Amino acid sequence: MRVLDSHLHLWDPSVLDYPWLEGPLRARFAAEEIAGTIGEVGDERGFVFVQADCLEAQYLDEIDWVTSLAEQVGVRGIVAGARLDRGAATVRHLDAFAERPLVVGVRHLLQGEPVGFAATPAFRAGAAALAERGLTFDACVRGEGQLRDVIRLAAEMPELRIVLDHLGKPAVGTAATPSLPSAEWANALTALAAHSQVFCKLSGLPAEARGSWSAEQTEPFFDVALEAFGPERLMVGSDWPVSAVTASGWNSGADAALDAGAIGAWADAVASWAASRAVDVDAILWSNAERFYRLS
């Protein structure tokens, strides 16, 4: 089994500034730390790094730092941080990627913006500049209102390749008290998937469960995504280290409360589910991410 993890975070608070970090996540997660977690993950593996919300002024520094680790970690592509609503400054920022060949896409973290932000002229101008450069957009949203914003974005900008992070962050409950997919979320996912340039990451649900998750709990959500997108537009993502925080880590902030086997456990859960549905496991674990991000 080979695994191309489409959603990896790396950071070092001694190198860059991340105001949002707290609890067990306020630590270094870089080459040395991930080396101890991936020994059992696949016969062949690679990663797509996704920006980790450092300070905006450090976005290019983040790319350069991750690039310095790329060979050691196995990073094959970088989804860079960018504000798409800065007009000429956005264009200059995107043009700086030309000297940074690992950059394959951008994430402007929409979950921190108000509903409707993705329809503003300033954001749309930046999104158009992104599409013109052949770069992808990672849409990280929460709630049906923001999901509807991404549906509208996809409908009105078919030239922009979009991937939905973390299935849109649905409410999943916990392993002990699991939730079933809501009709609103399922309908929104189906509407989004109607646009063929949109893909979806099977990622992030352990964090939504606050570290208390089970493979069985995730399957109804995967099934909705499969029905909507088909097996050719789904990709696995570990969301490491955020989704590696254990329930005790979320509850107490304990410094050591991370699951060392989280990357492998998530890949195994996705692979087992895909096999049980008789769909192409390698597509979801590898080739779809490679195709979407156009990794060489």
Locate predicted features:
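Mid-domain alpha/beta scaffold segments of enzyme catalytic cores
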Residues: 1-133, 145, 180, 192, ...
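Active-site micro-motifs of SAM-dependent methyltransferase domains
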Residues: 10-12, 54, 169, 207, ...
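Charge-dense, low-complexity intrinsically disordered segments
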Residues: 25, 53, 117, 176-179, ...
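Hydrophobic packing residues within well-ordered alpha-helices of enzyme cores
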Residues: 66, 150-153, 270
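Active-site glycine-centered loops adjacent to acidic/histidine catalytic or metal-binding residues
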Residues: 239
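Secondary-structure boundary/capping positions in well-ordered alpha/beta enzyme cores
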Residues: 73-76, 104, 160-161, 199, ...
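Catalytic pocket-lining loop regions of alpha/beta-barrel enzymes
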Residues: 119-235, 244-251
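Mid-to-C-terminal alpha-helical segments outside catalytic/metal-binding sites
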Residues: 1-6, 19, 27-46, 224, ...
